[in-house]
Amino acid sequence: MTYINSYKGQDWLLPTSIKQMISDKHICFFVEEFVDSLDFTNFDMIYEGAGHPAYHPRIIMKIIIQGMLSKERSSRKLSGACRENLVFIYLAEKVQPNFRTIARFRKNNGKFIKEVFKETVDLASDNGLVDLNMICTDGSKIKANSSKKMFLKKEQIERLDSIIDKMIEEDIKQDEIDKEIYGEKEENITDIEIKNLKGIVKSYREIKNKEKLKENCKRAVEEFDKDALIKRVSLSDPECRMMKNKKGVFELDYNTQFTVDSKNQIIVANDVCKDRTDTFQLQPQINNVRENITLNEDTKIVADCNYNNGENLKFLEEEKLNGYIPTISQAQKLDDKKQKKEDDYEYDWDKDEIILDGTRLKFHALWKHRGNKRQRWYKSEDGRIVRRVPEFFRERLRMKKKLETKEGKKIYSLRKTIVEPVIGNIKYNLGFTEFLVRGLDGAKLELNIASISHNLKKIWVARGRIGKNNEVIVFDLIIKNNQMNCDPTCKNKLLTNIPFFMHKQIKHYL
């Protein structure tokens, strides 16, 4: 057996192109093409004027997106990849941005990154990958960048705040003492030696950014004022909350929300919230979808039982949206789980009466019971039997009836194959199981980057499927072009009817 010849010297007569060393089927070329099509003119005003030239935001954006696709999210790892990884060297155009540059760009451009996510939705829609026949919403908890050791009560934080004040006072006094000690210059000690001496003394002290810690204490106390239900707050990230994940483990998390189109699993809306449940997230998600893309009149909106809230169902009916959200017992039945006990009454829609064990109860009043949400009170004629039901129980009954039909069951069963695989892809294929940036705004920013990467990969895969029929498409275009007598304006009109990623391949035929 002989071995393949290798070349340890690795010398080339002529330097090879980095692009040629990457597979022509690599997704990085699609990332490059997409980012190059974005508008970066707003950054020109930021970077204009005197000073050291800045890295073009186009380059940093390519690095961040490719990093998410390659499961490399840390700014330090991305900076290292720009020196060691051929794909990143190619996308970085042979420059090597510092990790601080990457982290600073990511931190300071949340609005721009959100607009880029909208661009991916528009791109998918323009290429026929989104039809909005059905959208599915679901939530998933993702671990925050915070430690349980810093999860403190309000009294503990206030006590810590007072301790920090004393430490700052001591530091001020120590600085005055240092000035007296180091200010008296001796003949045998030079300025450099005094500077070294200061460093030695400083190394023996406990070094902490007390001002930053004090600011965190202030933010943590503000969170108690915003949310009266919480008893503890994380000092390192006051906006995250203690939540129970699917494994039954309590950890500091953020609740992420995804709304996915059924045709190609394109994410059309996302969000991050501090709520422990998904109950109040349906309306914000639908509003987010409307900001990104226009909903059809007959769009089916599917969500699990966690979104079955009276206000949500009322909202769907008022907006004339076709919702499919089961009750807890219906969801358990569809999932072959032990069912929760159902209500034991019937409802007469014509007379607005409840039938309980053969006795008819008439509507009496709409009241609040012990400070809870408003309830509808039904009472028998003799006043001996009273039944309280939720204010929007009729909307619940209509939704329940819809989910009991054969069509309703079939539509709801598709939810698992639409939105849940998307969450699984983001968490496990992209490695997005924990936030790196702290704060709610930082979490939203990171989720947008993950959604951009997911959508681009879906479009790239669809590009491969379209590519199988390219010969037929090109043949049809040549015929149309000949019929147009090669008029340049007609060529442009022709190109607008096909996906942008096929333009380069087709232009040389026209």
Model-assigned labels for residue ranges:
Residues 1-29:
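Hydrophobic alpha-helical membrane-insertion signals
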Residues 3-6, 64, 71-84, 95-510:
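Anion-binding and metal-coordination hotspots
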Residues 4-8, 52-54, 89-90:
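A short, ordered amphipathic alpha-helix with a cationic face
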Residues 19, 23, 69-70, 94:
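Amphipathic alpha-helical interaction elements
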Residues 24-65:
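Basic, short loop/linker segments at the boundary and entry of helix-turn-helix/winged-helix-like folds
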Residues 36-44, 69-73, 84-91:
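Short helix-loop boundary/capping segments at the starts of domains
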